Protein backbone atom coordinates (compact mmCIF):
# COMPACT_ATOMS: atom_id res chain seq x y z
CA UNK A 1 0.00 0.00 0.00
CA UNK A 2 1.34 3.41 -0.92
CA UNK A 3 1.13 6.18 1.65
CA UNK A 4 1.55 9.93 2.06
CA UNK A 5 -0.68 10.58 -0.93
CA UNK A 6 -3.80 12.69 -1.12
CA UNK A 7 -5.61 12.35 -4.41
CA UNK A 8 -7.05 15.52 -5.89
CA UNK A 9 -9.39 15.97 -8.83
CA UNK A 10 -8.89 19.09 -10.94
CA UNK A 11 -11.13 20.16 -13.83
CA UNK A 12 -9.60 22.56 -16.35
CA UNK A 13 -12.17 24.37 -18.49
CA UNK A 14 -11.66 26.80 -21.34
CA UNK A 15 -12.32 27.63 -24.93
CA UNK A 16 -10.47 26.30 -27.95
CA UNK A 17 -6.70 27.05 -27.78
CA UNK A 18 -7.09 28.59 -24.32
CA UNK A 19 -4.07 26.74 -22.89
CA UNK A 20 -5.96 23.93 -21.11
CA UNK A 21 -3.84 21.04 -22.35
CA UNK A 22 -0.58 22.91 -21.79
CA UNK A 23 -1.64 23.76 -18.24
CA UNK A 24 -2.58 20.10 -17.63
CA UNK A 25 0.86 19.03 -18.81
CA UNK A 26 2.44 21.38 -16.27
CA UNK A 27 0.76 19.33 -13.54
CA UNK A 28 2.41 16.24 -14.99
CA UNK A 29 5.84 17.85 -14.92
CA UNK A 30 5.51 18.15 -11.11
CA UNK A 31 4.26 14.59 -10.64
CA UNK A 32 6.12 11.32 -10.64
CA UNK A 33 4.46 8.66 -12.76
CA UNK A 34 1.90 10.01 -15.24
CA UNK A 35 -0.77 8.23 -17.25
CA UNK A 36 -2.26 10.30 -20.07
CA UNK A 37 -5.74 9.19 -21.16
CA UNK A 38 -6.43 10.43 -24.69
CA UNK A 39 -10.11 10.38 -25.65
CA UNK A 40 -9.76 11.78 -29.20
CA UNK A 41 -10.07 9.47 -32.16
CA UNK A 42 -8.03 10.35 -35.26
CA UNK A 43 -10.82 10.09 -37.83
CA UNK A 44 -9.34 12.40 -40.49
CA UNK A 45 -6.04 14.01 -41.50
CA UNK A 46 -6.63 17.19 -39.48
CA UNK A 47 -7.39 15.16 -36.35
CA UNK A 48 -4.36 12.90 -36.93
CA UNK A 49 -2.13 15.98 -37.09
CA UNK A 50 -3.65 17.36 -33.88
CA UNK A 51 -3.23 14.01 -32.08
CA UNK A 52 0.37 13.73 -33.32
CA UNK A 53 1.14 17.31 -32.20
CA UNK A 54 -0.25 16.64 -28.72
CA UNK A 55 1.55 13.28 -28.48
CA UNK A 56 4.92 14.80 -29.44
CA UNK A 57 4.52 17.53 -26.81
CA UNK A 58 4.25 15.00 -23.97
CA UNK A 59 7.27 13.58 -22.13
CA UNK A 60 8.30 10.17 -23.46
CA UNK A 61 8.11 8.53 -20.03
CA UNK A 62 4.39 9.21 -19.68
CA UNK A 63 2.18 6.23 -20.38
CA UNK A 64 -0.48 7.03 -22.98
CA UNK A 65 -3.79 5.18 -22.92
CA UNK A 66 -6.15 5.78 -25.84
CA UNK A 67 -9.66 5.38 -24.46
CA UNK A 68 -12.53 7.09 -26.28
CA UNK A 69 -15.40 5.67 -24.17
CA UNK A 70 -14.41 3.76 -21.01
CA UNK A 71 -12.88 6.66 -19.10
CA UNK A 72 -14.16 5.57 -15.67
CA UNK A 73 -12.73 2.12 -16.29
CA UNK A 74 -9.38 3.65 -17.30
CA UNK A 75 -9.24 5.46 -13.95
CA UNK A 76 -9.83 2.20 -12.08
CA UNK A 77 -7.41 0.17 -14.23
CA UNK A 78 -4.51 2.59 -14.67
CA UNK A 79 -4.91 4.91 -11.66
CA UNK A 80 -3.20 2.56 -9.20
CA UNK A 81 -0.06 2.58 -11.39
CA UNK A 82 0.54 6.34 -11.36
CA UNK A 83 0.71 9.50 -9.30
CA UNK A 84 -1.28 11.58 -11.78
CA UNK A 85 -3.73 10.81 -14.54
CA UNK A 86 -4.47 13.46 -17.16
CA UNK A 87 -7.71 12.94 -19.10
CA UNK A 88 -7.68 15.03 -22.27
CA UNK A 89 -10.43 15.66 -23.00
CA UNK A 90 -14.04 15.39 -21.86
CA UNK A 91 -15.11 17.23 -25.01
CA UNK A 92 -14.14 14.31 -27.23
CA UNK A 93 -15.46 11.86 -24.62
CA UNK A 94 -18.90 13.52 -24.88
CA UNK A 95 -18.78 13.45 -28.70
CA UNK A 96 -17.74 9.79 -28.61
CA UNK A 97 -20.68 8.95 -26.33
CA UNK A 98 -23.08 10.57 -28.78
CA UNK A 99 -21.50 8.82 -31.78
CA UNK A 100 -21.65 5.44 -30.03
CA UNK A 101 -25.23 6.09 -28.91
CA UNK A 102 -24.09 5.16 -25.40
CA UNK A 103 -26.17 5.84 -22.32
CA UNK A 104 -24.82 9.28 -21.52
CA UNK A 105 -26.14 9.54 -17.97
CA UNK A 106 -24.71 6.16 -16.99
CA UNK A 107 -21.34 7.22 -18.43
CA UNK A 108 -21.36 10.56 -16.58
CA UNK A 109 -22.43 8.89 -13.34
CA UNK A 110 -19.71 6.24 -13.74
CA UNK A 111 -17.06 8.90 -14.33
CA UNK A 112 -18.16 10.92 -11.31
CA UNK A 113 -18.25 7.80 -9.14
CA UNK A 114 -14.67 6.97 -10.20
CA UNK A 115 -13.62 10.55 -9.36
CA UNK A 116 -15.10 10.51 -5.85
CA UNK A 117 -12.22 8.45 -4.49
CA UNK A 118 -9.66 8.03 -7.27
CA UNK A 119 -6.55 5.87 -6.81
CA UNK A 120 -4.38 8.79 -8.02
CA UNK A 121 -4.72 12.51 -8.60
CA UNK A 122 -6.68 13.29 -11.76
CA UNK A 123 -6.64 16.34 -14.04
CA UNK A 124 -9.48 16.51 -16.56
CA UNK A 125 -9.50 18.88 -19.53
CA UNK A 126 -12.77 20.06 -21.09
CA UNK A 127 -14.09 22.80 -23.30
CA UNK A 128 -16.48 25.41 -21.97
CA UNK A 129 -19.01 25.59 -24.79
CA UNK A 130 -21.90 27.30 -23.02
CA UNK A 131 -20.73 30.83 -23.76
CA UNK A 132 -20.75 30.49 -27.53
CA UNK A 133 -23.30 30.80 -30.27
CA UNK A 134 -26.33 28.50 -30.07
CA UNK A 135 -25.63 25.66 -32.53
CA UNK A 136 -27.82 25.70 -35.64
CA UNK A 137 -28.54 21.96 -35.69
CA UNK A 138 -30.23 19.74 -33.08
CA UNK A 139 -27.16 17.46 -32.90
CA UNK A 140 -24.95 20.45 -32.09
CA UNK A 141 -27.33 21.62 -29.39
CA UNK A 142 -27.48 18.10 -27.93
CA UNK A 143 -23.66 17.96 -27.83
CA UNK A 144 -23.45 21.39 -26.16
CA UNK A 145 -26.04 20.35 -23.58
CA UNK A 146 -24.36 17.00 -22.88
CA UNK A 147 -20.94 18.58 -22.40
CA UNK A 148 -22.42 21.28 -20.17
CA UNK A 149 -24.12 18.63 -18.02
CA UNK A 150 -20.91 16.58 -17.88
CA UNK A 151 -18.80 19.61 -16.90
CA UNK A 152 -21.25 20.51 -14.12
CA UNK A 153 -21.28 16.95 -12.77
CA UNK A 154 -17.48 16.68 -12.77
CA UNK A 155 -17.15 20.17 -11.23
CA UNK A 156 -19.34 19.07 -8.32
CA UNK A 157 -16.98 16.21 -7.39
CA UNK A 158 -13.73 18.01 -8.28
CA UNK A 159 -11.51 19.50 -5.59
CA UNK A 160 -10.40 22.25 -7.98
CA UNK A 161 -12.01 23.85 -11.02
CA UNK A 162 -10.05 26.34 -13.11
CA UNK A 163 -11.09 28.31 -16.17
CA UNK A 164 -8.28 29.01 -18.65
CA UNK A 165 -8.54 32.21 -20.67
CA UNK A 166 -5.65 33.21 -22.96
CA UNK A 167 -3.44 30.75 -21.09
CA UNK A 168 -4.22 32.32 -17.72
CA UNK A 169 -5.96 30.27 -15.01
CA UNK A 170 -8.89 31.65 -13.05
CA UNK A 171 -9.91 29.73 -9.92
CA UNK A 172 -13.58 28.83 -9.85
CA UNK A 173 -13.24 26.32 -7.00
CA UNK A 174 -10.33 25.18 -4.82
CA UNK A 175 -6.68 26.08 -5.39
CA UNK A 176 -4.82 27.77 -8.22
CA UNK A 177 -1.96 25.27 -8.16
CA UNK A 178 -3.17 22.09 -6.48
CA UNK A 179 -0.43 19.95 -5.02
CA UNK A 180 0.38 16.86 -7.06
CA UNK A 181 3.07 14.94 -5.26
CA UNK A 182 4.43 11.49 -5.97
CA UNK A 183 3.26 8.72 -3.71
CA UNK A 184 5.84 7.47 -1.27
CA UNK A 185 6.26 3.76 -0.73
CA UNK A 186 6.50 2.71 2.88
CA UNK A 187 10.00 2.04 4.16
CA UNK A 188 10.78 -1.60 4.76
CA UNK A 189 12.79 -2.11 7.93
CA UNK A 190 15.72 -4.47 7.73
Regions found by a protein language model. Name each.
Residues 2, 9-77:
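Conserved P-loop
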Residues 11, 86, 123-125:
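Structural motif
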Residues 34, 85, 160-163:
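Short, well-ordered beta-strand core segments
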Residues 7, 31, 80-83, 119:
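Short, high-confidence coil segments that cap the C-terminus of an alpha-helix
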Residues 60-106:
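Helix-adjacent hinge/juxtasegments
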Residues 24, 54, 86, 127, ...:
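Residue-level signal for inorganic ion chemistry
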